[in-house]
UniProtKB/Swiss-Prot annotation:
Residues annotated to bind Fe cation: H121, H125, D315
Cofactor note: Binds 1 Fe(2+) ion per subunit.
Entry cofactors: Fe(2+)
Protein name: tRNA N6-adenosine threonylcarbamoyltransferase
Function: Required for the formation of a threonylcarbamoyl group on adenosine at position 37 (t(6)A37) in tRNAs that read codons beginning with adenine. Is involved in the transfer of the threonylcarbamoyl moiety of threonylcarbamoyl-AMP (TC-AMP) to the N6 group of A37, together with TsaE and TsaB. TsaD likely plays a direct catalytic role in this reaction.
Catalytic activity, reaction form: L-threonylcarbamoyladenylate + adenosine(37) in tRNA = N(6)-L-threonylcarbamoyladenosine(37) in tRNA + AMP + H(+)
């Protein structure tokens, strides 16, 4: 396959608690079009436990994936014989789910003699703005989700430099833990955002972790502990206490995030010049307060903020299909012994928080 062809790729996503499949077209000029994008969330299955249970997630993927793939193909109006490639998220993620998705993709590719592309889930997030907005390289990615918080220089397909990461909790993880601590329902992120809208952020003097440091790393464990200490002091909590705690927590996250992104953008400019855009991806980007803060950060850095539509910020099959198509256009495919991975760094040389070194993402 070459970039001069129109490519049709099926993408499969099963790394956490969304079972998803999509068909995406990549045209010869590099533009893309989503033909179908089917996502089945497992929130109802995991809500009684207050978080994702890996075994339940894997079993749900087994039960759901065949039907979701069939629906994606039907909605796209195409057949397996017409596919240019089959892409699956091969990690990082919950290993049981990753195995389900990758094995399914291998079976389809083998039966129909179609190229297989084993996609890094993080790379799929990184390349989504090229599908939605035709964003040109290089750009600065802020990936914030329940499992990941990273600032990444996106220099090309498979060419990434991690500028900053969290040394403890991911932002989405911290939101979920605060929600659980305060007795709010799962999933916690939207609940904290909703409560914060009715709270007084100035009531508590919560710390702003890592503020002013020259690196671009994040830390949220100390902030989380400060919230826990205040909640324990106020027990039993009144509804307004919960709102104020959420507001104070979210305000501290916003201040820390803005400072850390500012540092990341400075590192980007020092190494690679001005970014074409600041791109936000991951489920945390759906938080409206965070979006407002990101707009301010981008304006201060004199760059453009790009945020994919909410349905493409959270885990989905279209981003996997698109990353597969981008790699396929460069002739990058995988063999049937491609392994599922629970851990898979986007920048393979970034072994310590804040270390950055240019690398090609290998498969």
């Amino acid at each position: 396959m070459t970039s001069e062809q129109t490519l049709l790729v099926l993408g499969i996503e099963t790394t956490c608690d969304e079972t998803a499949a999509a068909v995406v077209e990549r045209r010869a000029d590099g533009s893309g079009r989503i033909l179908s994008n089917i996502v089945r969330s497992q929130i109802d299955e995991h809500a009684p436990f207050g978080g994702v249970v890996p075994e339940i997630a894997a079993r749900a993927h087994v039960d759901l994936l065949d039907g979701i793939v069939a629906n994606a193909m039907r909605e796209a109006g195409t057949g397996f014989a017409q596919l240019s490639g089959v892409a699956a998220a091969a990690g990082p993620g919950l290993i049981g789910g990753v195995i389900v998705g990758l094995t399914t993709a291998k079976a389809i590719a083998l039966v129909h003699n179609t190229p297989l592309i084993a996609v890094n889930h993080l790379e799929a997030h990184a390349l989504t703005p090229r599908l939605t907005d035709a964003t040109e390289f290089p750009y600065c990615l802020f990936l914030a989700s329940g499992g990941h918080t990273q600032i990444v220089a996106v220099l090309g397909v498979g060419d990434y430099v991690r500028l900053g990461t969290t040394v403890d909790d991911a932002i989405g993880e911290a939101f979920d833990k605060i929600a659980k601590m305060l007795g709010l329902p799962y999933p916690g992120g939207p609940q904290v955002e909703r409560a914060a809208a009715s709270g007084d952020a100035a009531r508590f003097a919560f710390p702003r972790p890592m503020l002013g440091r020259p690196d671009a790393n994040f830390s949220l464990s100390g902030l989380k502990t400060a919230v826990r200490n205040e909640a324990s002091r106020l027990t039993p909590l009144e509804p307004q206490d919960i709102n104020d705690l959420c507001a104070g927590f979210q305000a501290a996250v916003l201040d820390s995030m803005a400072d850390r992104l500012g540092a990341g953008l400075r590192l980007f400019r020092e190494r690679f010049g001005a970014p074409k855009a600041l791109v936000a991806a991951g489920g945390v980007a759906a938080n409206q307060a965070i979006r407002r803060s990101l707009r301010e950060v981008a304006a201060k850095a004199q760059t453009t903020l790009m945020v994919p539509p909410p349905a493409l910020c959270t885990d989905n099959g279209a981003m996997i299909a698109w990353a597969g198509a981008e790699r396929l256009a460069l002739g990058l495919t995988d063999t049937m012994d491609a392994a599922p991975r629970a851990r898979w760094l986007l920048d393979a040389n970034a072994t310590a928080p804040g270390k950055f070194a240019n690398t090609r993402a290998g498969f």
